Curated annotation (Swiss-Prot):
GO molecular function: (3R)-hydroxyacyl-[acyl-carrier-protein] dehydratase activity
Pfam family membership, one: FabA
Enzyme class: lyase
UniProt source species: Thermomicrobium roseum (strain ATCC 27502 / DSM 5159 / P-2)
Function comment: Involved in unsaturated fatty acids biosynthesis. Catalyzes the dehydration of short chain beta-hydroxyacyl-ACPs and long chain saturated and unsaturated beta-hydroxyacyl-ACPs.
Catalytic activity line of the entry: a (3R)-hydroxyacyl-[ACP] = a (2E)-enoyl-[ACP] + H2O
Descriptive protein name: 3-hydroxyacyl-[acyl-carrier-protein] dehydratase FabZ
Active site, UniProt feature: H48
EC number: 4.2.1.59
SUPFAM superfamilies in alphabetical order: Thioesterase/thiol ester dehydrase-isomerase
Underlying gene: fabZ
Compartments in which it is found: Cytoplasm
GO biological process per UniProt: fatty acid biosynthetic process; lipid A biosynthetic process
Alphabetic keyword roster: Cytoplasm, Lipid A biosynthesis, Lipid biosynthesis, Lipid metabolism, Lyase
């Protein structure tokens, strides 16, 4: 299990954009399961939507991507890389995620060829599917990541 401070040693995300509270299962380079406890204090609930707070779907996908990045970048082969979103395919949202929900984020890493890879993600609340889809990512050396435009 990894706590937030350990996650931050692997990926660069920080508050308010770190969307994973802990990792509860991990097979380095292959898969991970993370948890996000969704609270009413999330900054995005201020405007999405007043009186009817719903976690934006794009942030659910970002949370899945962060879990996948932890699984991949924690593997010795990829520790010196930075992962970037390259695309999403077949994403479907099945239920809203609201304050008080515990989001379970499961990611299976697929093929990685050269510096491009895929992962399949599923987000659930109380066993009910909230979102799923395929994530595409690019792996770059940190210096290239800072200078790529």
């Amino acid at each position: 299990m990894l706590e937030a401070w350990q996650i931050q040693e692997i990926i660069p995300h920080r508050y308010p954009f770190l969307l994973v509270d802990r990792i509860i299962e991990i097979e380095w380079g292959q898969r991970a399961v993370g948890i996000k406890n969704v609270t009413v204090n999330e900054p995005f609930f201020v405007g999405h939507f007043p009186g009817n707070p719903v976690m934006p779907g794009v942030l659910i996908i970002e949370a899945l991507a962060q879990v996948g990045a932890v699984a991949l970048l924690g593997h010795p082969q990829y520790r010196d890389k930075t992962a970037f979103f390259a695309g999403i395919d077949g994403v479907r949202f099945k239920r809203p995620v609201r304050p008080g929900d515990t989001l379970r984020l499961e990611v299976q890493i697929g093929k990685v060829r050269r510096n491009i890879g895929t992962g399949t993600g599923r987000a659930t609340v109380d066993g009910e599917l909230a979102a799923e889809g395929e994530i595409l990512f690019a792996l770059l050396d940190p210096e290239a990541a800072r200078t790529t435009r």
